[in-house]
Each structure stands twice: as structure tokens, then as C-alpha cells.
Amino acid sequence: MNPHAKLICTVSLIMGTSITISSNHWILAWTGLEINTLAIIPLISKSHHPRAIEATIKYFLTQSTASALILFSSMTNAWSTGQWDITQLNHPTSCLMLTMAIAIKLGLVPFHFWFPEVLQGSSLITALLLSTLMKLPPITLLLLTSQSLNTTLLTLLAISSTLIGGWMGLNQTQTRKILAFSSISHLGWMIMIISYNPQLTILTFILYTIMTSTVFLSLAQIKVLKLSTLLISWTKTPMLNATVMLTLLSLAGLPPLTGFMPKWLIIQELTKQEMTPMATIITMLSLLSLFFYLRLAYHSTITLPPNSSNHMKLWRTNKTLNTPTAILTALSTTLLPLSPLIITML
């Protein structure tokens, strides 16, 4: 891809995200979302592979539909209340349409079918952008309108996303699809708590972004796109594979790693809100995700394929962790002891 085109797309992505998360007016927020969509399309299709072109078309169709719904819901609200302010969403039909539009943009169940397919057609770095940066503007809109939205509907979306995200990830062999279903499952946790404690949703999203970035960057360094490749990469890059394993266990929410903190805090908050049955259900459903994280961890470090060499480590030029990956790995695995400090900052 032309460096100038890549620079323009990157700047547009940052600008679109900034416009949406800092705006109070629906038209400005919608403009930021459209800039984001137009900026990411060249990055998805840059390989010119048929699968990448297919992923681009799917992404464009779903995002344009969701953006049109957001614009329509804001117009309906403005027509009935005379307000274009994002926080003044009072019309019930507008609230319902906005919830559907954000669910499509985020890839929540039952509007999730486009997300794994688009990630599968993208490169690992573009998939990282789709899983993290592109989720930020819709989540910001949800945070700003969370007090107006239907809590029962959000809970239903959250439970179904955690269930389907874990269930459909069980039989996948492509790492990008597994991480796509992981994203859907994590979004379920965020949406579950958004009406009760928005700050906790922000914390969960930040920690999810850190952990997912570590996995994607590590996989991009060792060029792993499927489980069979991950299986044989241990002999070439044991350090990076160990990094992937620890981060995956952190994503699964196992103590004493960072990923345990948001799940623990969400369960605690749900219990305080007298929603113990919901907390129990979402915790049990997260065991499905735990299974495929453990499967990935098993393939990355715990098992070795049949091989003719007597040595576990093949001779290769050492691939060292680059600085961003090293910092993200440290944050992905060691933040749990700092949880009291983080809780006081919420």
C-alpha cells in the first residue's frame, strides 16, 4: 500500500474517532463514524485478495446500514423532542433503533455474523484495529446514552453475545476468527454492566484493548494465522509463544493475571445491584471462552508436533520482543496487584 495513502487513512481514523468521542451533537458523532468507515475500508482491502474484497464489501454494507439507523434514530428524537444533544435521547423508538444500530456496529449477537468474516479477510494489524479502535466510537455513544436505553434489552444482548461468542469459537481453527468470537464475548461483559457502572465499562474496554493488542502483535510477529502454524512456531520463537500463552490466559480471566480484574469487578457490581442470577449466568457462559483460550494456549506452548529433530529449540536468528509488545505484555499480565489503586480511580 502507498505510504501516503496509509498515512491519510491512519490520520482519518484518529480524526474520526476523536470527533465521535468528543461530540455532543448527533450530526458530528455520525460524521466521525462515517470518516472512520471510509478510512478503514482501504486498509481491509489493501491485499487485493478476493477474500479481502469480500470482507470490505460486507464491512461497508453493515456499517452504512448501522450509520443510517443512527442518523434516523437521532432525527426521530429531534423531531419529537427538539433536541440534537446525544445525552437527551428520550424517545422510546429512537432508543430502540439506536441500540440496534450500535449492536450492528459492535457486532453484538444477533448482528454478529459480519464480524468474524471481516476479520478473517483482513491482515492481523487491520484485524487489531477493527477489534479495538473501531469499537471505541460506538461504545462511547452507548456510554453517553446508557441511562436512556432499555436495561432488559441490553442484558439480553449481553447474555446472548457471551453465549454465542464462546460457543461459536469452540470449533474454529483460524486465529483471527477465534479472536473475533473472543471480542464478541468480551463485549457481552461490557454491555452487561454499562447501565449500572459506565466507568467499569471503560476500564474493561481499556484492559481488553491492551490484552488483545498484545495477542495480535505477537501473532503478527510470528506470522501465525491458524492453529497448525501456531503448533510449529514454538521451536522457532519460544519467547513470543510464551507471551501469547500468558496473554490468552489473561484474556480468559484467570487469576493472578490482569484479565481477572474486570470480570471480578463486574461480578461484584452485578451482585451489588441484586442481579446475582445474571452474574452467575454470565460467569458460567464465560467457561466456553475459557475452553478455546486454553486450546490456543495448549497449541502455542504446551504441546509439540511430531518432529525429526532431537532438540526442542531449532537454531534460528532470535526474534526479540519489540518495545510496544513488551510493554503491552507487562500490562496484560501484571496489573492485578494494582487493582485497589485502579478501583479508587474509578
Swiss-Prot record:
GO terms for cellular component: mitochondrial inner membrane; respiratory chain complex I. It is a multi-pass membrane protein. It is found in: Mitochondrion inner membrane. The keyword Disulfide bond does not apply. The chain crosses the membrane at residues 25-45, 52-72, 95-115, 124-144, 149-169, 178-198, 200-220, 242-262, 274-294, 326-346. It catalyses: a ubiquinone + NADH + 5 H(+)(in) = a ubiquinol + NAD(+) + 4 H(+)(out). Core subunit of the mitochondrial membrane respiratory chain NADH dehydrogenase (Complex I) which catalyzes electron transfer from NADH through the respiratory chain, using ubiquinone as an electron acceptor. Essential for the catalytic activity and assembly of complex I. It is an enzyme of class 7 (translocase). It holds the Pfam family NADH_dehy_S2_C. This is NADH-ubiquinone oxidoreductase chain 2. InterPro entries: Complex_I_Subunit_2, NADH_DH_su2_C, NADH_UbQ_OxRdtase_chain2, ND/Mrp_TM. GO terms for molecular function: NADH dehydrogenase (ubiquinone) activity. One of its GO terms (biological process) is mitochondrial respiratory chain complex I assembly. Signal peptide: none annotated. Core subunit of respiratory chain NADH dehydrogenase (Complex I) which is composed of 45 different subunits. The keyword Phosphoprotein does not apply. Its EC number is 7.1.1.2. Coiled coil: none annotated. Keywords: Electron transport, Membrane, Mitochondrion, Mitochondrion inner membrane, NAD, Respiratory chain, Translocase, Transmembrane, Transmembrane helix, Transport, Ubiquinone.
